[in-house]
A protein has these predicted regions:
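Alpha-helical scaffold within the catalytic cores of cyclic-nucleotide enzymes
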Residues: 79-83, 110-128, 153-156, 253-254
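Residue-level recognition of strand-loop junctions within catalytic nucleotide-signaling folds
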Residues: 103-106, 141-142, 224, 241
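Single conserved hydrophobic/aromatic residue that forms the stacking wall/gate
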Residues: 1-13
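A short glycine-enriched loop-to-beta-strand structural element that forms part of the catalytic core
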Residues: 50, 97-103, 128-160, 168-174
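Conserved long alpha-helical elements within nucleotide-processing catalytic cores of c-di-GMP signaling
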Residues: 16-21, 26-50, 57-83, 87, ...
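Active-site core of bacterial EAL-family cyclic-dinucleotide phosphodiesterase domains
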Residues: 36, 183-239
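Catalytic core of bacterial c-di-GMP phosphodiesterases, primarily the EAL and HD-GYP domains
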Residues: 117, 209, 213-218, 243-254
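C-di-GMP signaling machinery
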Residues: 43, 148, 157-201, 239-244
């Protein structure tokens, strides 16, 4: 009976571990991270915490070009680098795919150490032309009752601002970024109806030689928005490109 009790206890411990940890990296999973971060920030009231989210640009290409085994090696190394300074006030997790999260005291965050860690990760691809771009968003926790999922969203909003900037690896969240994100999502939500309502218009801007002779024209697109007026490409082209929707505008115009 004692042996059965011990076996049952060990199985229970293993089941709890599987339910709370990522099987590949051994880090906490998303749900456990949310729970533990909420508990920690409310336990240490005198500590200001950062919540940091990281992502690897175009990680799917690593799996496609180098194979799943190489992709898993990168994820495991990323996990080790993220969790390289453990303490009772540091929590690290793999949220999903190539997305990781870290919560730690503000005074323990070191940008130089982050840059060094990213360089270490990039060495996985030394000797070939593939450039690994890892980027992070940092959110300072001010409202300890805010849902951790919202904190993660805000850190990711900051991270997304440097997704295509290979010279930068860390970005900090502020409320202005949230306003921009909301505006971008609003435009994306209006894009499909705008196509159906023929709100996009192409203008041809003449190009002339020095002698005044015409040599062609440049096609310029304007969004004739029903409530915002005429929007120039600067207001929506980058948003559509980042969302992978620019091809729909190309098909519509041409």
């Amino acid at each position: 009976e004692i042996r059965l009790s011990l076996v049952g206890s060990e199985m229970c411990i293993r089941d709890r571990y599987k339910a709370s940890h990522d099987s590949l990296t051994g880090l906490l999973n998303r749900d456990q991270f949310y729970e533990d971060v909420h508990d920690m920030v409310n336990k240490y009231h005198d500590t200001t915490f950062y919540l940091i989210c990281s992502n690897i640009k175009d990680f799917k290409f690593i799996n496609e070009i180098f194979g799943m085994e190489k992709g898993n090696q990168v994820l495991i190394k990323q996990a080790k680098l993220m969790a390289s300074n453990p303490s009772e006030r540091t929590i690290c997790a793999r949220l999903m795919n190539d997305r990781f999260a870290l919560c730690l005291p503000r005074e323990e965050f070191d940008e130089k150490r982050v840059a060094d860690s990213i360089k270490e990760l990039q060495r996985e691809f030394s000797g070939n032309s593939f450039h690994l771009h890892t980027y992070m968003g940092v959110y300072e926790i001010r409202d300890r009752d805010e849902a951790v999922s919202i904190m993660v969203d805000k850190a990711n909003i900051a991270a997304d601002t440097i997704k295509n900037n290979y010279d930068c690896c860390v970005a900090y969240y502020d409320e202005h970024l949230l306003e921009i994100s909301i505006e971008q999502r609003r435009l994306l939500g209006e894009f499909e109806p705008a196509l159906q309502n023929d709100e996009f218009v192409m203008y041809l801007q003449p190009q002339v030689k020095r002698d005044g002779a015409a040599k062609g024209a440049e096609a310029l697109v304007r969004w004739v928005h029903p409530s915002r007026g005429i929007l120039t490409p600067y207001a929506f082209i980058d948003i559509l490109e980042n969302a992978g929707l620019i091809y729909k505008l190309d098909l519509y115009i041409w």
